[in-house]
A protein has these predicted regions:
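Motif-centric detector for short Cys/His coordination patterns
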Residues: 1-90, 123
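Ampipathic, surface-exposed secondary-structure segments
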Residues: 2-28, 132-159
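Functionally constrained cores in energy, signaling, and assembly domains
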Residues: 7, 28, 33, 44, ...
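Extended, alpha-helix-rich binding/interface surfaces that flank or overlap catalytic cores
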Residues: 73-113, 117-128, 134-209
Length: 209
């Protein structure tokens, strides 16, 4: 198993900063970690890096952890989205790595907000194709199967004469297709999608050993 190498962990009044061995700094707010917020400097210094990328403070309780892969994924998404903004959000002008990260971020953001149809309606076929390819590349098999099935359901209406824009998709689906996408598969995505940040961080960052 490849793991992050953590050099140090530092605290300010409001934040915890994780410095990786390659010099990269990951930050999180202490408001997300109330037990760390209340802990003394000595207690905060007694951390352990677990094999799965979690930083643990076992003396403060089993649930007092910091997921470095999740923080790393946040940082990778911000970097890729900043690159996309500089290019006018034209994904074809990005390097493949950044393109995939942006597509996955959009899938996460819209998928957890309004579901697959919001993602597909906002970003279209090309983004969906890139996201599916990226899910396969990072090994997010459970999430890939769900999103691939949702995309497959839309295939029936791709040549429908009343399909003028992505906004028409939902109304052209049969009731059972709507139910499968929204009532069955979206909730499955909300559970399975938890695998994306950690697998994506592992795949896209070279700071693992």
């Amino acid at each position: 198993m490849r793991n992050l190498s953590v050099g140090s962990i530092d605290f300010t009044k409001a934040h915890v900063s994780v410095t990786l061995a390659d010099g990269r700094i990951l930050r999180d707010t202490l408001s997300r970690n109330p037990d760390l917020l209340k802990a003394s400097a000595t207690q905060r210094s007694e951390w352990t890096l677990l094999d799965d990328g979690l930083v643990s403070w076992p003396h403060l309780g089993d649930k007092v952890t910091l997921d470095t892969r999740w923080l790393l994924w946040e940082a990778l998404c911000k970097q890729a989205n900043d690159e996309a903004m500089a290019k006018g959000f034209k994904l074809d002008e990005l390097q493949p790595r950044s393109r995939e990260i942006v597509a996955l971020w959009r899938l996460e953001a819209d998928g957890y907000n309004g579901g697959f149809m919001q993602f597909f309606g906002n970003w279209g076929e090309e983004n969906c194709r890139i996201a599916l390819s990226a899910l396969q590349a990072i090994g997010a098999d459970a999430t890939y199967a769900i999103v691939a099935r949702q995309r497959e359901i839309l295939e029936r209406i791709k040549d429908h004469p009343d399909l003028k824009s992505y906004e028409d998709l939902w109304s052209l689906l049969a009731k059972e297709e709507q139910d499968e996408i929204g009532d069955k598969l979206d909730p499955e995505f909300w559970k399975a999608g938890d695998e994306i940040p950690r697998l994506a961080a592992l795949h896209y960052c070279e700071c693992f050993t």
